[in-house]
From Swiss-Prot:
NCBIfam families: gal_kin, PRK05101.1. PROSITE patterns: GALACTOKINASE, GHMP_KINASES_ATP. It comes from Enterobacter sp. (strain 638). The record marks R28 as: Transition state stabilizer. The gene is galK. The active site is at D174. It is found in: Cytoplasm. This is Galactokinase. It comes from the Bacteria.
Length: 382
Protein backbone atom coordinates (compact mmCIF):
# COMPACT_ATOMS: atom_id res chain seq x y z
CA UNK A 1 0.00 0.00 0.00
CA UNK A 2 1.41 3.40 -0.94
CA UNK A 3 1.94 6.09 1.68
CA UNK A 4 -0.80 8.12 0.01
CA UNK A 5 -3.30 5.23 0.20
CA UNK A 6 -2.30 4.47 3.78
CA UNK A 7 -2.80 8.05 4.97
CA UNK A 8 -6.01 8.56 2.99
CA UNK A 9 -7.68 5.45 4.37
CA UNK A 10 -6.59 6.22 7.94
CA UNK A 11 -7.86 9.79 7.48
CA UNK A 12 -11.34 8.66 6.39
CA UNK A 13 -11.49 5.97 9.07
CA UNK A 14 -10.48 8.31 11.91
CA UNK A 15 -11.99 11.65 10.95
CA UNK A 16 -15.09 10.25 9.24
CA UNK A 17 -14.72 12.20 5.99
CA UNK A 18 -12.27 12.07 3.04
CA UNK A 19 -9.04 14.09 2.84
CA UNK A 20 -9.08 16.78 0.16
CA UNK A 21 -5.32 16.93 -0.46
CA UNK A 22 -2.27 14.68 -0.30
CA UNK A 23 1.12 16.39 0.01
CA UNK A 24 4.59 14.86 -0.20
CA UNK A 25 8.05 16.19 0.67
CA UNK A 26 11.17 14.11 0.00
CA UNK A 27 14.25 13.23 2.02
CA UNK A 28 17.63 14.00 0.51
CA UNK A 29 21.18 12.86 0.06
CA UNK A 30 24.07 15.26 -0.33
CA UNK A 31 26.37 14.24 -3.18
CA UNK A 32 29.16 16.62 -2.14
CA UNK A 33 29.58 19.74 0.01
CA UNK A 34 29.76 18.60 3.64
CA UNK A 35 29.75 21.02 6.59
CA UNK A 36 29.82 23.89 4.09
CA UNK A 37 26.20 25.01 4.56
CA UNK A 38 26.62 26.83 7.88
CA UNK A 39 29.79 28.43 6.47
CA UNK A 40 27.65 30.16 3.80
CA UNK A 41 29.13 27.83 1.18
CA UNK A 42 27.90 25.49 -1.55
CA UNK A 43 26.21 22.08 -1.39
CA UNK A 44 25.08 19.65 -4.10
CA UNK A 45 22.21 17.48 -2.81
CA UNK A 46 19.40 15.69 -4.60
CA UNK A 47 15.94 14.84 -3.32
CA UNK A 48 15.28 11.09 -3.12
CA UNK A 49 12.24 8.88 -3.63
CA UNK A 50 11.71 8.37 0.09
CA UNK A 51 9.31 10.90 1.50
CA UNK A 52 6.84 12.15 4.07
CA UNK A 53 3.23 12.08 2.86
CA UNK A 54 0.39 13.96 4.56
CA UNK A 55 -3.28 13.53 3.73
CA UNK A 56 -5.13 16.59 4.91
CA UNK A 57 -8.17 18.83 4.79
CA UNK A 58 -9.16 22.28 6.04
CA UNK A 59 -11.28 22.66 9.15
CA UNK A 60 -13.74 25.49 9.64
CA UNK A 61 -12.37 26.28 13.11
CA UNK A 62 -8.89 27.06 14.50
CA UNK A 63 -7.97 23.55 15.67
CA UNK A 64 -5.14 21.45 14.21
CA UNK A 65 -5.53 17.68 14.65
CA UNK A 66 -2.69 15.35 13.70
CA UNK A 67 -2.27 11.57 13.52
CA UNK A 68 1.18 9.98 13.16
CA UNK A 69 0.62 6.70 11.32
CA UNK A 70 4.23 5.61 11.94
CA UNK A 71 3.94 6.04 15.71
CA UNK A 72 1.04 3.68 16.44
CA UNK A 73 -1.42 6.35 15.29
CA UNK A 74 -0.49 8.69 18.14
CA UNK A 75 -2.49 11.90 18.01
CA UNK A 76 -1.91 15.56 18.74
CA UNK A 77 -4.33 18.46 18.89
CA UNK A 78 -3.68 22.16 19.43
CA UNK A 79 -5.39 25.49 18.83
CA UNK A 80 -4.10 28.32 16.64
CA UNK A 81 -5.64 30.76 19.14
CA UNK A 82 -3.49 29.58 22.06
CA UNK A 83 0.29 29.98 22.37
CA UNK A 84 1.84 26.91 20.72
CA UNK A 85 4.21 25.21 23.19
CA UNK A 86 6.31 22.06 23.04
CA UNK A 87 4.66 18.67 23.61
CA UNK A 88 5.85 16.97 26.79
CA UNK A 89 6.28 13.45 25.47
CA UNK A 90 5.86 13.25 21.68
CA UNK A 91 8.95 14.54 19.90
CA UNK A 92 7.36 14.15 16.45
CA UNK A 93 4.60 16.57 17.54
CA UNK A 94 7.15 19.31 18.08
CA UNK A 95 8.16 19.33 14.42
CA UNK A 96 4.51 19.90 13.47
CA UNK A 97 3.87 22.44 16.21
CA UNK A 98 7.11 24.30 15.49
CA UNK A 99 6.35 24.62 11.78
CA UNK A 100 2.82 25.89 12.45
CA UNK A 101 4.00 28.33 15.12
CA UNK A 102 6.62 29.83 12.78
CA UNK A 103 4.14 29.90 9.88
CA UNK A 104 1.87 32.05 12.05
CA UNK A 105 4.71 34.55 12.47
CA UNK A 106 5.05 34.72 8.67
CA UNK A 107 1.39 34.73 7.71
CA UNK A 108 -1.71 34.79 9.87
CA UNK A 109 -4.01 33.92 6.96
CA UNK A 110 -4.78 30.29 7.75
CA UNK A 111 -7.09 28.29 9.97
CA UNK A 112 -7.28 24.76 11.33
CA UNK A 113 -6.66 21.47 9.55
CA UNK A 114 -6.80 17.70 9.99
CA UNK A 115 -3.59 15.85 9.06
CA UNK A 116 -2.53 12.21 8.83
CA UNK A 117 1.24 11.77 8.43
CA UNK A 118 3.28 8.78 7.24
CA UNK A 119 6.78 8.49 5.84
CA UNK A 120 9.44 6.09 4.64
CA UNK A 121 12.58 8.24 4.98
CA UNK A 122 14.88 6.11 7.16
CA UNK A 123 15.25 7.85 10.53
CA UNK A 124 18.62 8.50 12.11
CA UNK A 125 20.41 7.73 8.84
CA UNK A 126 21.19 11.34 7.94
CA UNK A 127 18.68 11.40 5.07
CA UNK A 128 16.70 14.30 6.55
CA UNK A 129 13.48 12.72 7.70
CA UNK A 130 12.92 15.75 9.97
CA UNK A 131 13.37 18.32 7.17
CA UNK A 132 11.05 16.26 4.99
CA UNK A 133 8.39 16.41 7.73
CA UNK A 134 8.86 20.17 8.28
CA UNK A 135 8.57 20.96 4.57
CA UNK A 136 5.56 18.66 4.17
CA UNK A 137 3.69 20.38 7.04
CA UNK A 138 4.55 23.84 5.68
CA UNK A 139 3.37 22.83 2.21
CA UNK A 140 0.09 21.49 3.65
CA UNK A 141 -0.92 24.89 5.02
CA UNK A 142 0.42 26.73 1.98
CA UNK A 143 -1.70 24.55 -0.34
CA UNK A 144 -4.84 24.34 1.80
CA UNK A 145 -4.96 28.09 2.40
CA UNK A 146 -3.18 29.36 -0.76
CA UNK A 147 -0.57 31.16 1.33
CA UNK A 148 1.78 33.39 -0.72
CA UNK A 149 4.90 31.43 0.29
CA UNK A 150 7.41 29.97 -2.15
CA UNK A 151 9.54 26.87 -1.63
CA UNK A 152 12.48 28.82 -0.19
CA UNK A 153 10.22 30.48 2.40
CA UNK A 154 8.69 27.13 3.38
CA UNK A 155 12.23 25.76 3.73
CA UNK A 156 13.39 28.69 5.88
CA UNK A 157 10.29 28.29 8.01
CA UNK A 158 11.16 24.64 8.61
CA UNK A 159 14.75 25.50 9.50
CA UNK A 160 13.57 28.14 11.99
CA UNK A 161 11.19 25.63 13.57
CA UNK A 162 13.98 23.08 13.96
CA UNK A 163 16.50 25.60 15.32
CA UNK A 164 14.22 27.56 17.62
CA UNK A 165 11.34 25.26 18.56
CA UNK A 166 12.78 21.73 18.36
CA UNK A 167 16.19 23.04 19.47
CA UNK A 168 18.46 21.45 16.88
CA UNK A 169 21.02 23.63 15.12
CA UNK A 170 20.86 22.84 11.39
CA UNK A 171 21.81 24.60 8.18
CA UNK A 172 19.32 25.35 5.39
CA UNK A 173 20.30 22.63 2.88
CA UNK A 174 18.00 19.84 4.05
CA UNK A 175 14.80 21.88 3.95
CA UNK A 176 15.71 23.67 0.73
CA UNK A 177 16.35 20.51 -1.30
CA UNK A 178 13.15 18.93 0.09
CA UNK A 179 11.17 21.98 -1.04
CA UNK A 180 12.89 22.62 -4.37
CA UNK A 181 14.29 19.28 -5.59
CA UNK A 182 14.01 18.50 -9.30
CA UNK A 183 13.47 15.08 -10.82
CA UNK A 184 16.63 13.52 -12.34
CA UNK A 185 18.70 16.49 -11.13
CA UNK A 186 20.89 17.50 -8.25
CA UNK A 187 20.68 21.08 -7.00
CA UNK A 188 23.73 23.30 -6.55
CA UNK A 189 22.70 25.51 -3.64
CA UNK A 190 24.41 28.71 -2.58
CA UNK A 191 23.70 28.66 1.16
CA UNK A 192 24.22 32.42 1.47
CA UNK A 193 21.91 33.71 -1.27
CA UNK A 194 19.73 30.54 -1.30
CA UNK A 195 20.15 30.65 -5.08
CA UNK A 196 19.81 27.23 -6.72
CA UNK A 197 20.91 25.75 -10.02
CA UNK A 198 19.53 22.43 -11.27
CA UNK A 199 22.30 20.10 -12.45
CA UNK A 200 21.26 17.09 -14.57
CA UNK A 201 22.61 13.75 -13.43
CA UNK A 202 24.38 11.71 -16.13
CA UNK A 203 22.08 9.32 -18.01
CA UNK A 204 22.16 5.86 -16.50
CA UNK A 205 23.71 6.99 -13.21
CA UNK A 206 22.33 5.49 -10.00
CA UNK A 207 22.37 7.16 -6.59
CA UNK A 208 23.18 4.46 -4.04
CA UNK A 209 22.96 5.11 -0.30
CA UNK A 210 24.45 2.59 2.10
CA UNK A 211 23.68 2.97 5.81
CA UNK A 212 26.59 1.80 7.96
CA UNK A 213 24.09 1.20 10.79
CA UNK A 214 26.81 2.37 13.15
CA UNK A 215 24.93 4.17 15.91
CA UNK A 216 25.85 7.84 15.86
CA UNK A 217 26.54 9.12 19.37
CA UNK A 218 28.88 12.11 19.10
CA UNK A 219 27.02 13.82 16.34
CA UNK A 220 25.39 16.63 18.38
CA UNK A 221 28.31 17.71 20.54
CA UNK A 222 30.94 17.26 17.83
CA UNK A 223 28.80 19.10 15.27
CA UNK A 224 28.62 22.12 17.55
CA UNK A 225 32.40 21.96 18.17
CA UNK A 226 33.04 21.95 14.41
CA UNK A 227 30.80 24.98 13.97
CA UNK A 228 32.67 26.84 16.69
CA UNK A 229 36.03 25.96 15.11
CA UNK A 230 34.82 27.28 11.74
CA UNK A 231 33.58 30.49 13.37
CA UNK A 232 36.97 30.89 15.06
CA UNK A 233 38.59 30.56 11.63
CA UNK A 234 36.29 33.16 10.08
CA UNK A 235 37.03 35.59 12.95
CA UNK A 236 40.78 35.11 12.43
CA UNK A 237 40.34 36.27 8.82
CA UNK A 238 37.94 39.02 9.95
CA UNK A 239 35.27 37.70 7.61
CA UNK A 240 31.58 36.99 8.28
CA UNK A 241 32.01 33.37 7.14
CA UNK A 242 34.62 31.01 5.71
CA UNK A 243 32.89 31.41 2.35
CA UNK A 244 34.68 34.77 2.13
CA UNK A 245 38.21 33.39 2.63
CA UNK A 246 40.24 32.37 -0.43
CA UNK A 247 42.56 29.36 -0.44
CA UNK A 248 45.45 31.68 -1.33
CA UNK A 249 44.81 33.90 1.71
CA UNK A 250 44.52 30.81 3.88
CA UNK A 251 47.73 29.19 2.63
CA UNK A 252 49.74 32.34 3.37
CA UNK A 253 48.82 32.44 7.06
CA UNK A 254 47.75 28.87 7.89
CA UNK A 255 50.83 28.45 10.12
CA UNK A 256 49.56 31.25 12.41
CA UNK A 257 46.28 29.46 13.18
CA UNK A 258 45.68 26.84 15.85
CA UNK A 259 46.60 23.51 14.14
CA UNK A 260 43.14 21.98 14.66
CA UNK A 261 41.34 25.09 13.38
CA UNK A 262 43.73 25.07 10.39
CA UNK A 263 42.54 21.58 9.44
CA UNK A 264 38.86 22.49 9.84
CA UNK A 265 39.21 25.64 7.72
CA UNK A 266 41.17 23.80 5.02
CA UNK A 267 38.35 21.26 4.72
CA UNK A 268 35.67 23.93 4.27
CA UNK A 269 37.65 25.95 1.70
CA UNK A 270 38.65 22.95 -0.40
CA UNK A 271 35.18 21.38 -0.10
CA UNK A 272 33.55 24.54 -1.43
CA UNK A 273 35.84 24.52 -4.45
CA UNK A 274 35.19 20.79 -5.01
CA UNK A 275 31.42 21.28 -4.84
CA UNK A 276 31.36 23.99 -7.50
CA UNK A 277 33.61 21.88 -9.74
CA UNK A 278 31.46 18.79 -9.12
CA UNK A 279 28.39 20.61 -10.47
CA UNK A 280 30.30 21.29 -13.71
CA UNK A 281 31.56 17.70 -13.93
CA UNK A 282 28.03 16.33 -13.51
CA UNK A 283 26.58 18.74 -16.06
CA UNK A 284 29.18 17.45 -18.55
CA UNK A 285 28.36 13.82 -17.70
CA UNK A 286 31.89 13.31 -16.36
CA UNK A 287 31.43 10.58 -13.74
CA UNK A 288 35.17 9.93 -13.63
CA UNK A 289 35.96 13.49 -12.47
CA UNK A 290 32.98 13.41 -10.11
CA UNK A 291 34.45 10.25 -8.58
CA UNK A 292 37.83 11.92 -8.04
CA UNK A 293 36.17 14.90 -6.34
CA UNK A 294 34.09 12.61 -4.09
CA UNK A 295 37.27 10.72 -3.11
CA UNK A 296 39.02 14.01 -2.25
CA UNK A 297 35.97 15.09 -0.25
CA UNK A 298 35.98 11.87 1.76
CA UNK A 299 39.71 12.12 2.50
CA UNK A 300 39.22 15.71 3.65
CA UNK A 301 36.35 14.72 5.97
CA UNK A 302 38.45 11.88 7.36
CA UNK A 303 41.77 13.69 7.81
CA UNK A 304 41.02 17.42 8.13
CA UNK A 305 37.47 17.60 9.50
CA UNK A 306 37.80 14.28 11.36
CA UNK A 307 34.15 13.27 11.21
CA UNK A 308 34.33 9.76 9.77
CA UNK A 309 34.48 6.50 11.75
CA UNK A 310 36.25 3.23 10.82
CA UNK A 311 32.98 1.58 9.72
CA UNK A 312 32.28 4.40 7.24
CA UNK A 313 35.85 4.36 5.93
CA UNK A 314 35.54 0.59 5.45
CA UNK A 315 32.34 1.00 3.40
CA UNK A 316 33.97 3.65 1.21
CA UNK A 317 37.01 1.41 0.63
CA UNK A 318 34.85 -1.59 -0.35
CA UNK A 319 32.81 0.44 -2.86
CA UNK A 320 35.85 2.25 -4.29
CA UNK A 321 37.73 -1.02 -4.79
CA UNK A 322 34.70 -2.37 -6.70
CA UNK A 323 33.97 0.57 -9.01
CA UNK A 324 37.47 1.94 -9.66
CA UNK A 325 37.11 5.10 -11.76
CA UNK A 326 33.54 4.33 -12.89
CA UNK A 327 31.98 6.68 -10.33
CA UNK A 328 32.39 8.01 -6.82
CA UNK A 329 31.71 7.27 -3.16
CA UNK A 330 32.04 9.27 0.05
CA UNK A 331 30.53 9.68 3.48
CA UNK A 332 27.45 11.87 3.41
CA UNK A 333 25.73 13.75 6.24
CA UNK A 334 26.93 15.14 9.54
CA UNK A 335 29.39 12.35 10.29
CA UNK A 336 30.26 9.90 13.09
CA UNK A 337 28.32 7.12 11.41
CA UNK A 338 25.31 7.35 9.13
CA UNK A 339 25.59 6.71 5.41
CA UNK A 340 27.86 6.74 2.41
CA UNK A 341 26.61 7.87 -1.00
CA UNK A 342 27.82 6.42 -4.27
CA UNK A 343 27.13 7.77 -7.75
CA UNK A 344 27.69 4.91 -10.17
CA UNK A 345 26.47 3.54 -13.52
CA UNK A 346 23.26 1.53 -12.96
CA UNK A 347 24.87 -1.64 -14.31
CA UNK A 348 27.41 -1.56 -11.45
CA UNK A 349 24.77 -1.62 -8.69
CA UNK A 350 24.64 -5.46 -8.35
CA UNK A 351 28.44 -5.72 -8.12
CA UNK A 352 28.58 -3.03 -5.45
CA UNK A 353 25.74 -4.63 -3.50
CA UNK A 354 27.47 -8.04 -3.63
CA UNK A 355 30.84 -6.66 -2.54
CA UNK A 356 29.35 -4.76 0.38
CA UNK A 357 27.17 -7.65 1.57
CA UNK A 358 30.14 -10.05 1.42
CA UNK A 359 32.71 -7.80 3.10
CA UNK A 360 31.19 -5.11 5.34
CA UNK A 361 29.63 -7.27 8.04
CA UNK A 362 32.64 -9.62 8.01
CA UNK A 363 34.93 -6.65 8.70
CA UNK A 364 32.79 -4.66 11.15
CA UNK A 365 30.25 -7.02 12.72
CA UNK A 366 27.41 -4.75 11.53
CA UNK A 367 24.93 -5.42 8.72
CA UNK A 368 24.47 -2.51 6.30
CA UNK A 369 21.24 -1.31 4.70
CA UNK A 370 21.35 -0.65 0.95
CA UNK A 371 19.13 1.85 -0.89
CA UNK A 372 19.04 2.58 -4.61
CA UNK A 373 17.42 5.99 -5.08
CA UNK A 374 16.03 8.10 -7.88
CA UNK A 375 16.65 11.86 -7.79
CA UNK A 376 13.12 13.14 -7.24
CA UNK A 377 10.85 16.16 -7.35
CA UNK A 378 10.57 18.48 -4.35
CA UNK A 379 7.48 19.05 -2.22
CA UNK A 380 4.00 19.32 -3.70
CA UNK A 381 0.71 17.50 -4.22
CA UNK A 382 0.89 13.78 -4.84
Amino acid sequence: MSLKDKTQSLFAETFGYPATHAIQAPGRVNLIGEHTDYNDGFVLPCAIDYQTVISCAKRDDRIVRVIAADYDNQTDEFSLDEPIVAHDTQQWSNYVRGVVKHLQMRNKGFGGADLVIAGNVPQGAGLSSSASLEVAVGTVFQQLYHLPLDGAQIALNGQEAENQFVGCNCGIMDQLISALGKKEHALLIDCRSLGTKAVPLPKGAAVVIINSNFKRTLVGSEYNTRREQCETGARFFQQPALRDVSLNEFNKVAHELDPVVTKRVRHVLTENARTVEAASALAQGDLKRMGELMAESHASMRDDFEITVPQIDTLVEIVKATIGDKGGVRMTGGGFGGCVVALIPEEWVPAVQDAVSQQYEAKTGIKETFYVCKPSQGAGQC
